[in-house]
């Protein structure tokens, strides 16, 4: 059967929260089959557990934030994206502050940590959410219109369009499509960094956001150009980072999707609305397992081969 996965060994790192600016220690621990991804705020007098869940998202301003009462775990999307990309179903995530560290602004460090810990298969079938009919969410009109859609597809593919009307972004691709039957998450998506604009920093920081942002963990632009001395990692890094985010946001559904995701100018809020809309329309999806890897769509066999 196509099996669930966790990691073999504990692994930890230290970083800074991109929004809080606070130092945080991140520990990734193996978890039993059928546990799911569970975040633990170990810095509190009594540890609070926050399972990764689309319905557990309480804030989507510039990040996906899990919330349980007054307890938060912010900026989970890059780690969730790496877990989706490597096919990891079960994991304990210990944090000593309210935000997952930003590392270099991409998912690459998390991929490295997870691979370093060793990926192991477990004696339980991996369950997938197969989309049976299109689900779409929209907001705004005219120039402000944005939308996201899930549609049936035997595999996992994403197509994303952006429109920032900024010279540094417009000089790169504003559209990318990735089908994991033929593309690699690790090589083509994981290294794409988050990005921001110098002229927005002051306003964001006044809202308690972007306090840990820097050229070390984001692509930063002024009115005309990219300020990072090393330039871009991919010619289409901006739109690929939006795909990276979407993969992480959708993995908050708790299981890998058998579907195609198509979006125009979507972000964390719309991605979460889409995930919730899918869960609410129960005739639009089904849970499936595969008796063997050969039965599963190529998209999952291609990327998830154990080293």
UniProtKB/Swiss-Prot annotation:
CC per GO annotation: membrane
GO MF annotations, alphabetized: metal ion binding; UDP-3-O-acyl-N-acetylglucosamine deacetylase activity
Keyword Zinc: yes
Family note: Belongs to the LpxC family.
Active site positions: 268 (proton donor)
Organism (species): Bordetella pertussis (strain Tohama I / ATCC BAA-589 / NCTC 13251)
Source organism phylogeny: Bacteria, Pseudomonadati, Pseudomonadota, Betaproteobacteria, Burkholderiales
Top-level taxon in the UniProt lineage: Bacteria
Protein name: UDP-3-O-acyl-N-acetylglucosamine deacetylase
Pathway(s) per entry: Glycolipid biosynthesis; lipid IV(A) biosynthesis; lipid IV(A) from (3R)-3-hydroxytetradecanoyl-[acyl-carrier-protein] and UDP-N-acetyl-alpha-D-glucosamine: step 2/6
Membrane-crossing residue ranges in chain numbering: none
Keywords for this protein: Hydrolase, Lipid A biosynthesis, Lipid biosynthesis, Lipid metabolism, Metal-binding, Zinc
